[in-house]
UniProtKB/Swiss-Prot annotation:
Role played: With S4 and S5 plays an important role in translational accuracy. Located at the interface of the 30S and 50S subunits.
Subcellular localization(s) per the UniProt record: Plastid, Chloroplast
Main location: plastid
InterPro entries: NA-bd_OB-fold, Ribosomal_uS12, Ribosomal_uS12_bac
Encoding gene per record: rps12
Entry protein name: Small ribosomal subunit protein uS12c
Any single biological process term in GO: translation
GO annotation, cellular component aspect: chloroplast; small ribosomal subunit
Oligomer and partners: Part of the 30S ribosomal subunit.
Length: 122
């Protein structure tokens, strides 16, 4: 604990917390346009072809976002909504695309966890 003299000499430093999703600019979601849709491979112990998209956001950032679920209809120039949330085994992917809104279709034949994949009750 600092002495009074130490506090007079230099004030307490304020601790700022750094955001994990800076491209959202403190908003819950952001709209963007896909500039590239492609697959990439995950980090070491895992093996797959993960579907990702490079998205140019309304905030001016260009980010890599993960496309969740089985199958998608995204292509270049698709308008998407993204949210925060990283993908642990894909370095540099810190955002998720929200399914079932704007140009992104919901997951076909999805029965469980439907709200997470933009599927209406059948």
């Amino acid at each position: 604990m600092p002495t009074i003299q130490q506090l007079i000499r230099s004030e307490r430093k304020r601790v700022y917390n750094k955001t994990k999703s800076p491209a959202l600019k403190a908003c819950p979601q952001r709209r963007g346009v896909c500039t590239r849709v492609y697959t990439t491979t995950p980090k070491k112990p895992n093996s797959a072809l993960r579907k990702v998209a490079r998205v140019r956001l309304t905030s001016g950032f260009e980010v890599t976002a993960y496309i969740p679920g089985i199958g998608h209809n995204l292509q270049e120039h698709s308008v998407v909504l993204i949210r925060g949330g990283r993908v642990k085994d894909l370095p540099g992917v810190r955002y998720h695309i929200i399914r079932g809104i704007l140009d992104t279709a919901g997951v076909k034949d999805r029965a469980q966890s439907r709200s997470k994949y933009g599927v209406k009750r059948s």
